Regions:
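Beta-barrel outer-membrane channel/assembly domains of diderm bacteria
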Residues: 2, 14-16, 20-139, 162-172, ...
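Bacterial N-terminal signal peptides that target proteins for export
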Residues: 2-10
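Intrinsic disorder/low-complexity segments
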Residues: 11-14, 23, 216, 288
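Secondary-structure junction/capping motif
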Residues: 27-30, 202, 271
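Sequence/structural signature of outer-membrane beta-barrel proteins
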Residues: 47-53, 90-92, 139-150, 182-193, ...
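A generic structural micro-feature
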Residues: 61, 156, 200, 234, ...
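Surface-exposed coil loops of outer-membrane beta-barrel proteins
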Residues: 95-120, 129-233, 238, 300-335
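Detector for outer-membrane/organellar transmembrane beta-barrel domains
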Residues: 217, 245-355
């Protein structure tokens, strides 16, 4: 009860002070224009997903539709609001497993369960000195490696939180501060999850990201994530890190280092490190990149985790490493991306191994093509193939997606 009172007191206090921004309609000049100048958007995303995983006796064939309506008020004296509702429905037979449909073990998992939910609902304020938002919202930090929205799945991950963004002037360079207090994490598993995955993390967490540019084209970010989950204490951790992104001529550079340890009621006592380095080069419209990413292990007992990340974006689209193996993981990867006419193409190759010991986990090949039919409609084909060695099982995944926005 005390925890609930704290949540809503923080929400009420922030609304009274002010809060932050995303989708905005026109500026209102009177209170009545908050509604008359509001904006409504619709988004529909159809997806067919095929999964052939050697550990399951049957192949998954999932046909789903996400329908989204987003209403945003006009801004009045810096204040505005937003409400966004999503529905996910399967089309045809339910020949796949979700955490809630009782078919795990028969079919591979396709984490797009049916359901209707409020995806976002918040009050925001944007002023000259700061922006802030209170309510259910997206929080996407940097490349979403540590805090993200998992926008790839039909049901998005959003956060019940109070968020404040502050620009701070210093004698050297402006610094941007982004702080969030998070009391619930609304995960991708839908409103009716009754399987092994909780639909939300009950949270008492803090997320802080600060960035500055020491020179044009170069950015340094500092971050701290204190994650405390009542119903998933094994994911409770404290993480501190630094990242750099920049370019020298046609060469792009990215690097991150972080350290993590157990926090609050986590039953595991551990310390682990994270490292990432990537070099890219662009020539005649083709982007090339090579990188190394390590999620370290503490003597093979437990490894570095990022439970709030957009995990599908990293370590292969076959999603074999959503939870880091106890021996950790090293990923050496290569990327080629470009365009053929209006179509965007990208290919990835990953070579996975353990951080602790000498296990060869396997390799993965990924390819995607996206074609814009017009400004409102796009189609995408995407494929992932994971070839297992010492970890998991051979898996093929294929997706066909149609995205429509109005």
């Amino acid at each position: 009860m005390k925890r609930q009172t704290l949540k809503y007191s923080a929400l009420a206090a922030c609304i009274g002070l002010s809060p932050f921004s995303a989708l905005i309609a026109d500026e209102a000049t009177s209170f009545s224009e908050i509604l008359t100048k509001s904006d409504t958007k619709f988004n529909f995303r159809y997806r067919y997903e095929y999964v052939d995983d050697d550990k399951s006796p049957k192949e998954a064939n999932a046909s789903t539709l996400k329908s989204r309506i987003t209403w945003s008020s006009a801004s009045y004296k810096g204040f505005s609001g937003l409400v966004e509702v999503d529905n996910v429905s399967h089309i045809g037979g339910e020949n796949y497993a979700t955490p809630s449909n009782g078919k795990a073990g028969e079919y591979p998992i396709v984490a797009d369960p049916d359901g209707t939910d409020i995806n976002q609902i918040y009050l925001k304020y944007k002023g000259d000195s700061f922006t802030g938002i209170a309510g259910r919202q997206r929080i996407l930090h940097s490349g979403q490696r540590f805090v993200g929205g998992v926008g790839w799945r039909q049901n998005e991950q959003t956060y019940d939180s109070v968020r404040v963004q502050l620009p701070i002037s210093t004698a050297i360079t402006p610094v941007k501060i982004d702080y969030s207090y998070i009391w619930d994490v609304n995960r991708i598993f839908g409103p009716d999850t009754n399987g092994g995955q909780p639909r939300r993390y009950e949270s008492d967490s803090h997320a802080l990201y600060a960035s500055f540019s020491p020179a044009e084209g170069h950015t340094i970010g500092l971050f701290s994530y204190l994650l405390d989950f009542d119903n998933a204490s094994v994911n409770s951790s404290e993480t501190y890190g630094i990242e750099y992104k920049g370019a020298i001529g046609p060469v792009s550079i990215a690097a991150t280092a972080a350290t993590q340890s157990d926090y609050k009621e986590n039953p595991v006592d551990y310390d682990a490190e994270y490292y990432m380095a990537e070099l890219g080069y662009k020539i005649k419209g083709v982007a090339l990149a090579a990188g190394y990413e390590q999620l370290g292990s503490d003597d093979g007992e437990f490894a570095f985790r990022t439970p709030l990340a957009t995990l599908h974006k990293f370590q292969g689209w076959a999603d074999k490493f959503l939870v880091t193996p106890a021996d950790g993981i090293e990923d050496i990867y290569f990327k080629v991306a470009g365009k053929v006419g209006p179509a965007k193409l990208a290919m990835f190759y990953h070579d996975f191994s353990s951080d602790e010991g000498s296990d060869d986990y396997g390799t993965e090949f990924d390819v995607v093509a996206t074609y814009p039919v017009n400004k409102n409609v796009s189609v995408q084909m995407k494929y992932a193939r994971y070839d297992a060695e010492d970890f998991s099982t051979d898996t093929d995944k294929l997706w066909f997606t149609i995205n429509m926005k109005f």
